[in-house]
């Protein structure tokens, strides 16, 4: 029987490429996003993942018809700017999409996965979860929250045959860069450090890995028989993630500051 996969944020970027890779691997794929950007052979579900009631309604309808084997939580966005000048509603909106959107989808599929005694949930984090990027504070914090959530949930649902894992991409060439909500309010007070930091990040992203490669990697993990709690995408970022874990916090933060807070 073909596996049924749900992919959020499937209209563009990593989510779209993951949906395509899972379809090519033989899965029945449903992509969940607000915007319809048709993919041949993939079913589009128009929903906002931050709308808990809508998410539960549509997941209930689909799972009753065909079940669910895999959930990939790719939906996300980014904001940048100095914490001092970031409006609280913008910070909360960042968490609503990146973190609570993932929570809504996970909670919706868990009862069905538990009853069938199997399932795989993949949450997309970021290397920014371990290399905490200044002037991307709320983005980094939301991704760190995803990793904590993933590890906790993995232990909670393991007895039911459900595995939960997290993928840390580094810089990826997608429309995420252009879609980021940038604010340079206070750049004069911070002596140009906000704009320099964001420009540096965006340069790295434009020179990053292709989303096709990222999507194939995520699809491969989705179909593995067993998974680790966290995967890092790309050799260089695997080394960076390992260094962040091994280096003393003070030294690690000093190095990140040299790169992104000067």
Language model segments and positions:
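Active-site helix of classical SDR
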Residues: 106, 142-145
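Conserved glycine-rich Rossmann-like NAD(P)H-binding loop of the short-chain dehydrogenase/reductase
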Residues: 24-40
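SDR active-site lid
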Residues: 159-228
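Residue(s) in the substrate-gating loop at a strand-loop-helix junction
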Residues: 126
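Substrate-binding pocket helix/loop in short-chain dehydrogenase/reductase
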Residues: 82-83, 90-92
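N-terminal Rossmann NAD(P)H-binding glycine-rich loop of SDR-like oxidoreductase domains
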Residues: 11, 19
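Rossmann-fold cofactor-recognition segment
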Residues: 41-53
């Amino acid at each position: 029987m073909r596996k049924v996969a749900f992919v959020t944020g499937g209209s563009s970027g990593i989510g779209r490429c993951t949906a395509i890779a899972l379809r090519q691997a033989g899965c029945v794929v449903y992509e969940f996003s607000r915007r319809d950007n048709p993919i041949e052979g993939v079913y589009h579900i128009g929903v906002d993942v931050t709308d808990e009631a809508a998410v539960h309604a549509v997941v209930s309808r689909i799972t009753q018809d065909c079940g669910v084997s895999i959930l990939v939580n790719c939906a996300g966005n980014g904001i940048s700017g100095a914490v001092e000048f970031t409006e609280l509603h913008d910070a909360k909106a960042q968490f609503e999409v990146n973190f609570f959107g993932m929570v809504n989808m996970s909670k919706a599929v868990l009862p069905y996965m538990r009853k069938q005694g199997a399932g795989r949930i993949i949450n997309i984090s970021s290397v920014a979860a371990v290399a905490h990027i200044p002037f991307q504070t709320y983005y980094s914090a939301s991704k760190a929250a995803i990793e904590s959530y993933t590890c906790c949930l993995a232990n909670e649902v393991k007895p039911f045959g459900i595995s939960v894992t997290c993928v840390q991409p580094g810089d990826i060439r997608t429309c995420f860069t252009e879609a980021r909500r940038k604010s340079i309010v206070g750049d004069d007070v911070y002596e140009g450090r906000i704009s320099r930091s964001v420009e540096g990040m965006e340069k790295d992203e434009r020179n990053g890995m292709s989303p096709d490669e990222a999507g194939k990697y995520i699809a491969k993990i989705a179909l593995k028989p067993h998974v680790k709690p966290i995967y890092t995408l790309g050799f260089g970022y695997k080394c960076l993630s390992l260094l962040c874990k091994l280096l003393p916090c003070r030294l690690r933060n000093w190095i990140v500051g040299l790169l992104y807070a000067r």
